[in-house]
């Protein structure tokens, strides 16, 4: 059965990693579990590559912006992140949830999924990036709660 890489990653984070209960998971074992769950070998490989790249974020150091700039999305980026998603990311930057470094990481991870993203999936990518910055749990929990405070009319982060 052919699934998207996004579905494989959802399964990985929701079912496999939550069962690990804080234990470090072996990548080969995770790939094996995903294959046993019925995901295609190619999709499992791409999902594991995405997961490994996410882990390289490491110890993130926030950037203090003195002159905020507006991010213009390239045509390739706009293919994967539609206008609604772009507005969402701009709102997160305005609210201080993302700085330019984190925004670029989110965009890079979104494009790496190689398919246009729904707003819900973009929320998930943002959460995964923030959780992997090495920030304290309190910091990412606060940011995570801000991510979901979205006005349905214009998709800007409410303050």
Swiss-Prot record:
InterPro entries: Smg
Superkingdom, taxonomy of origin: Bacteria
A family per Pfam: DUF494
Matches recorded under PANTHER family: PROTEIN SMG
Family the UniProt entry places it in: Belongs to the Smg family.
Protein name as catalogued: Protein Smg homolog
Lineage of the species this protein comes from: Bacteria, Pseudomonadati, Pseudomonadota, Gammaproteobacteria, Cardiobacteriales
